[in-house]
Amino acid sequence: PIAGSMVLAAILLKLGGYGIIRMMQALPTTKTDMFLPFIVLALWGATLANLTCLQQTDLKSLIAYSSISHMGLVVATIIIQTPWGLSGAMALMIAHGFTSSALFCLANTTYERTHTRILILTRGFHNILPMATTWWLLANLMNIAIPPTMNFTGELLITSALFNWCPTTIIMLGLSMLITASYSLHMFLSTQMGPTPTNNQTEPTHSREHLLMVLHLTPLMMISLKPELII
């Protein structure tokens, strides 16, 4: 069920991140060197999740692994417990909560018309559903974290915090962001471009679907204009 995926990616996964923030504050202050293995594991896990996204053929699985990769960055920056890191973690959790939920919603819009989640079978929608293609483009650009979205603010703070703590982390962070851009563009091109399937009786998009996307992306735009609400 798509509603379960949206709630899981947008709320439950982020509540786990919030729980880690509260737990880290309750722990006694220890040397940050103690946390090095956990930070390496979190960043390595984020990179592996991104690489898994690149080889996915299932649209829903790709979006789910994308959420996991972003949470790897969040966990890594929560562990070092710097003000910038915690602000970046909160910003990215909220921003990616909206983004991943919107992507799941769009995946369901595609599934209702094609009855498949295989990427190679869901192509050519830019000709018949141009408005849905616009929503796909916006959601994927937010997933890549282009400025001036909240995703960009969160990733910038996370990158700064981790780089100040250990400059070597920029290698894994840079690799992770590069792969994120690759699979996001791959997802957009696979679902929207290419020849239009002739055997599908495609319904036009409904107002309900446009309203859902507006309700996902408008709060994200508003928070981007006033980031001090959450940072």
From Swiss-Prot:
GO terms for cellular component: mitochondrial membrane. GO terms for molecular function: NADH dehydrogenase (ubiquinone) activity; ubiquinone binding. The chain crosses the membrane at residues 1-21, 34-54, 62-84, 89-111, 128-148, 169-189. It is found in: Mitochondrion membrane. It is a multi-pass membrane protein. PANTHER family: NADH-UBIQUINONE OXIDOREDUCTASE CHAIN 4 (PTHR43507:SF20). This is NADH-ubiquinone oxidoreductase chain 4. It comes from Bothrops erythromelas (Caatinga lance head). The gene is MT-ND4.
